[in-house]
């Protein structure tokens, strides 16, 4: 099974079902319902789950359904929608809360997309509690409802869609990927995002807006802007915050691993029991180890045929992916981010799987034999043609970017040559586990080209004997043995002959092209070129000088300063009898001594390093200047945005501190930018506390002003409401009319009503459905007590109450109080350092003592604390007085101050005042119209 046992990143879990009938439950009868009615009813049931996030996927499904509908007759079945909805509603009304139900559904969704490693499979219950073991979701019957072990209801809705608890949808409408989507609560979505990305939300997650115009790091799911669609750079995560706290719409898209691909293959062959499953595995093992072709039912061939087909979804998403990549590049360029922070290490990250043989082979199939339907064995046999024709010659191979992958590949090539000589008639599959091809290897039947894939390393210079003549059409003549030699540690190329020399006839090898900086433009699709001027535009007639000039400006070769250092190093190497390989860890020299690879020492996590570098782009200061600005803080040196960025980089964890302290490097320039910055900041004591207190110092004035203004307005509004006599009389009129309406009911026995009843006056309409109780009250007051018509003029301050409620004012006040406590603690800490320094003036180690001349924290923060803390205490007392005033007002109007917020309390009165004013204006307009008509 090793020919299949590779990390094929395609979707094979959801397979086309053989059952086209729709069932509601285990005991229901078959419903003769064709596919179009099934699709229409499913769209009606899942209407709430469809959004712009899914438009691209649903567009492809709708096109497919429309094509199928042309060949089928439609027969209506009205039972399916009602039975399905009632069944799910009954199952979800159990003991679980909405939070527990959503959490179980999302956990089961991730569980069902994990590899099933046991022989039995995954346990699923039917409605009658009978057990069923499955190896993939394709084994679920369409229309049947099952339960997971957490009692989450699950149904396979159609060929490629499975719904869990009517909350989460697992969908795979292509053979490339799967998606998990739905609408969940914010907390549940946060947990799901952390499970999918394997990263805590508190560490920061980089999102782009849907149109690719904004890139931002989010630390809380609540910070998402309502109705805006966000996605990450590789389009695997999409989120949308819905209005009115309806939840978060999400979509996670991923690829299946090799175990899931194996299980999908087995599910496709429909094994009846574990013994059949074992027998299939044994047959695959025999296929791999035997030199004969597999004679059984090759399930693998059906899936491998699908590898060469490019899905329509991938073609449609190319423009969007290109736009997002350009957005990230524009963001980095606009923020002037240093590109050196990118990792140049050849080690593969933990979360990233190395490229597989199948991935590389598919790319080579598309490049070399595009348009043909040859099998995988034909590709391998074509790769063996050259060794068969030249069995006694040395083989020249292209070098990959990773030195670790060259050795297994050469071993595998030797094995391929031996296998070909032994059995020329058969084409057995090679050992895929040992054969490791890099996607950068270029094998050509005509000649051998060598391409360097390291961005910062120029191609090796020409070395060796005079070149062979230019290769004729295939089969090519064998190169001289002295010209090209195969060496696992070094690859020699023919040296370009000197123009002044007369030797060796024939042409010369084309020099290797230099790696260039890419120009990321938005390409026009081929189908749209005919509508543009580009279609008839003739190309520019260029020459060799153009290419040379462009390479001199934009190639990735080392800069002039590095070239000078190389020349000096070459001279010293010649004087030292070719001792150029002594510093092999940090520098690697080619045969001519013109190539130097200088690698950065990377210590931090990749995401952590990237985030720090993005935040550092806001500073136009050196790391030493940032440190000095923190120690000697002055207003204007660091802005609020810069302090927020510094706070986001902190704290430095104990693990990072130890790793940075014990790092082995000769010069700090060898470290990455993030590492250099943190090492510079590590010497500052209580770094994060300093940054937070400095940030508070810059913001405290505006915070106190805002609290003071809002508190004064709220206090005056409460006093105005308490002293309004007209409003009290209006309430009496309302009670009088309400008593008449409630006559003969238990509501008539009351002697008062709460203010939240005012909002219901607009909901109670007259028998002709044209007027409300508010209209009647306005008419009654206008005819009986007209002096009350303008009662809202005594409550004008209620309209000016700020949006923040009294509860928000008190909460902000408590936060400011905690900040002042933090400042006080830091002042005491630095005073203690100063005291210890005075006591240890005779200490021999002056570097470890507290140097007040370099630290102005006490000088800056002590006067600030004394001044603003006194002002805050006064404001704090004022807010407490307003709270007491509000509680008395609530009691005065019959409300419980413990069960109502100030926002709800005042909004009830304001809404009634607005409705009354609107009714009064309408009455005046009607009166004026009637007067004009009478005249």
Curated annotation (Swiss-Prot):
Belongs to the formin homology family. Diaphanous subfamily. Residues 431-443 have a biased composition (Basic and acidic residues). Pfam families: FH2. SUPFAM superfamilies: Formin homology 2 domain (FH2 domain). Residues 35-76, 702-730, 803-834 form a coiled coil. Formins play an important role in the nucleation of actin and the formation of linear actin filaments. InterPro entries: FH2_Formin, FH2_Formin_sf, Formin_Homology. GO terms for molecular function: actin binding; profilin binding. Signal peptide: none annotated. Residues 444-505 form the FH1 domain. Residues 456-482 have a biased composition (Pro residues). Residues 506-935 form the FH2 domain. Residues 384-407, 568-583 have a biased composition (Low complexity). This is Formin-I. Residues 418-428, 444-454, 484-499 have a biased composition (Polar residues). The lineage of its organism: Eukaryota, Amoebozoa, Evosea, Eumycetozoa, Dictyostelia. Keywords: Actin-binding, Coiled coil. SMART domains: FH2. The gene is forI. Residues 52-78, 380-511, 561-590 are annotated as: Disordered.
């Amino acid at each position: 099974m090793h020919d299949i046992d590779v990390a094929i990143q395609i979707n094979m879990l959801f397979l086309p079902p053989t059952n086209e009938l729709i069932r509601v439950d285990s005991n229901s009868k078959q419903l003769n319902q064709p596919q179009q009615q099934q699709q229409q009813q499913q769209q009606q049931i899942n209407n709430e789950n469809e959004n712009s996030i899914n438009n691209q996927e649903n567009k492809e499904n709708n096109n497919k359904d429309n094509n199928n509908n042309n060949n089928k007759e439609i027969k209506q079945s009205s039972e399916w929608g009602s039975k399905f909805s009632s069944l799910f509603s009954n199952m979800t009304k159990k003991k679980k809360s909405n939070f527990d139900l959503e959490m179980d559904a999302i956990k089961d969704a991730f569980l069902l997309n994990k590899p099933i490693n046991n022989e039995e499979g995954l346990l699923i219950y039917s409605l009658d509690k009978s057990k069923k073991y499955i190896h993939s979701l394709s084994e679920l019957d369409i229309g049947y409802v099952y339960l997971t072990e957490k009692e989450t209801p699950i149904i396979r809705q159609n060929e490629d869609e499975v719904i869990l608890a009517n909350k989460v949808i697992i969908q795979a409408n292509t053979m490339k990927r799967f998606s998990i989507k739905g609408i969940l609560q914010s907390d549940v979505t946060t947990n799901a995002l952390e499970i999918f990305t394997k990263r805590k939300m508190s560490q920061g997650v980089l999102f782009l807006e849907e149109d690719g115009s904004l890139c931002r790091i989010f630390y809380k799911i609540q910070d998402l802007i309502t109705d805006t669609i966000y996605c990450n750079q590789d389009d695997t995560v999409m989120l949308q915050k819905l209005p009115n706290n309806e939840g978060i719409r999400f979509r996670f898209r991923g690829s299946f691993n090799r175990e899931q691909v194996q299980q999908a293959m087995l599910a496709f062959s429909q094994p009846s029991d574990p013994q059949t499953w074992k027998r299939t595995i044994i047959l695959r093992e025999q296929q791999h180890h035997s030199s004969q072709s597999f004679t059984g039912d090759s399930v693998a061939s059906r899936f491998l045929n699908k590898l060469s087909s490019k899905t329509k979804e991938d073609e449609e998403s190319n423009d969007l992916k290109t736009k997002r990549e350009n957005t990230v590049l524009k963001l980095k360029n606009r923020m002037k981010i240093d590109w050196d922070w990118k990792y140049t290490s050849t080690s593969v990250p933990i979360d990233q799987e190395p490229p597989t043989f199948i991935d590389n082979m598919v790319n080579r199939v598309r490049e070399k034999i595009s348009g043909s339907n040859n099998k995988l064995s034909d590709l391998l046999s074509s790769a063996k043609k050259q060794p068969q024709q030249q069995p006694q010659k040395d083989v020249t191979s292209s070098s990959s970017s990773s030195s670790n992958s060259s050795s297994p590949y050469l071993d595998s090539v030797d094995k391929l040559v031996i296998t070909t000589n032994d059995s020329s008639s058969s084409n057995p599959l090679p050992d895929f586990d040992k054969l490791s091809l890099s996607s950068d290897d270029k094998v050509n039947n005509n000649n051998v080209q060598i391409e360097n894939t390291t961005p910062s390393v120029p191609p090796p210079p020409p070395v060796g004997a005079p070149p062979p003549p230019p290769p004729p059409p295939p089969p090519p003549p064998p190169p001289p043995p002295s010209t090209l030699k195969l060496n696992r540690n070094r690859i020699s190329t023919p040296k370009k002959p000197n123009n002044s020399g007369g030797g060796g006839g024939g042409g010369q090898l084309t020099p290797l092209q230099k790696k260039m900086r890419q120009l990321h433009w938005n390409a026009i699709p081929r189908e749209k070129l005919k509508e543009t001027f580009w279609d008839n535009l003739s190309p520019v007639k260029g020459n060799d000088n153009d290419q040379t000039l462009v390479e001199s400006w934009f190639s990735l070769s080392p800069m002039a300063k590095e070239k000078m250092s190389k020349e000096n190093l070459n001279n010293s190497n010649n004087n030292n009898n070719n001792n150029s390989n002594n510093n092999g860890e940090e520098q690697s020299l080619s045969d001519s001594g013109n190539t130097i690879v200088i690698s950065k020492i990377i210590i931090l996590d990749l995401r952590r390093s990237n985030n720090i570098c993005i935040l550092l782009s806001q500073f136009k200061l050196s790391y030493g200047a940032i440190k000095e600005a923190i120690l000697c803080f002055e207003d204007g040196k660091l802005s609020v945005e810069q302090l927020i960025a510094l706070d986001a980089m902190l704290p430095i964890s104990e693990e990072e501190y130890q790793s940075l302290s014990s790092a082995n490097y000769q010069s700090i320039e060898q470290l990455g930018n993030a590492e250099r910055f943190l090492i510079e900041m590590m010497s500052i004591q209580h770094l994060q506390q300093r940054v937070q207190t400095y940030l508070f110092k810059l913001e405290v004035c505006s915070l106190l002003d805002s609290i003071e203004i809002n508190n004064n307005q709220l206090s005056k509004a409460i006093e105005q409401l308490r002293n309004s006599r007209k409003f009290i009389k209006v309430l009496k009129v309302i009670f009088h009319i309400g008593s008449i309406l409630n006559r003969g009911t238990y509501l008539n026995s009351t002697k008062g009503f709460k203010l939240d009843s005012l909002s219901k006056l607009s909901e109670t309409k007259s028998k002709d459905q044209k007027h409300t109780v508010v209209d009647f009250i306005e008419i009654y007051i206008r005819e009986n007590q007209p002096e009350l018509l303008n009662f809202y003029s005594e409550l004008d301050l209620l309209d000016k109450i700020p949006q923040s409620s009294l509860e928000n004012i008190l909460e902000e006040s408590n936060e400011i109080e905690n900040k002042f406590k933090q400042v006080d603690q830091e002042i005491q800490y630095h005073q203690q350092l100063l005291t210890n320094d005075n006591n240890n003036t005779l200490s021999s180690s002056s570097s470890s003592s507290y140097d007040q001349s370099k630290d102005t924290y006490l000088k800056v923060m002590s006067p600030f604390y004394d001044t603003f803390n006194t002002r805050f205490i006064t404001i704090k007392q004022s807010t407490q007085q307003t709270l007491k005033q509000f509680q008395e007002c609530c009691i005065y109007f019959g409300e419980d101050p413990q069960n109502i917020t100030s926002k709800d309390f005042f909004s009830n009165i304001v809404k009634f005042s607005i409705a009354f004013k609107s009714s009064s204006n309408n009455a005046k307009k009607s009166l004026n119209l009637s007067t004009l008509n009478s005249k």
